Amino acid sequence: MSEVKKIATRESYGNALVEIGKEHEDLVVLDADLAGATKTAIFQKVFPERHIDCGIAEGNMMGVAAGLATTGKVPFASSFAMFAAGRAFEQIRNSIGYPHLNVKIGATHAGISVGEDGATHQCNEDIALMRMIPGMVIINPADDVEARAAVKAAYEYVGPVYMRFGRLAIPVFNDESTYKFELGKGVVLREGSDVAIFATGLEVYESMQAAEMLAADGINAKVINIHTIKPLDEELVVASAKECKKVVTVEEHSIIGGLGSAVCDTLCANYPTPVLKIGVNDVYGESGPAVQLVKKYGLDAESIYTKVRAFLA
């Protein structure tokens, strides 16, 4: 059996910017002295006149992006998730969110899979921060195919968008020839009636693998890819809860304020259902190889399988 192709979604981001930039001259890319790491250097190499390095000044970068948006440009402001959502939160809130400007934020190196950079750079709080900004769209793609499609969808959408990309190369499981990205709509990857598993980002593939293990035990898990966390596909969430009676959420993010919280908010208001939230518990990360950290923090397929089995017992 051939090995599964793996690509980091941060690389997908850089490649997608070039694809869009070839067709749309209004696209401008900004970075904060991290073009090599965020992969916007791919765009910079092709369109140097449309790439602006703002230096290590993320807040200023967001302000520059906001200004460009008022002139009709479509700016993509790029940095690590910790520095974009974290350090520049005030500028995103007040300069981009409040006036609802057409700025796209490309946040790379999100989650525990940043690896050796350690707790200071492993942003497990960004989705929670961005969810609280009125009108902010949040996208967390699951693989290369979805990531490139998501960047294009973000460009076409008029309004602020926060996109979350990873450092770790992850399996590409979507078929580019048939895949279609629809903003705000979840994707059912596997049907089942015993439990509904809502996953996002790199946890989608892990959840699919966990579902295979559960199937071997006679447990039929429905797996849903939630690439758009805001606006959430509430209709699909409620329908799946009614069908399966128990719900699991899986995310490479804190269990506080992320996908799990969004799903719980929806179910509390519409169809109260037992929910197991799998993610980073209320702790900081640590330095180590990304794959080992994913396993240590209980986010690999085997850990998901074990937790779901216990939840259903």
Model-derived segments and spans:
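Thiamine diphosphate
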Residues: 1-164, 169, ...
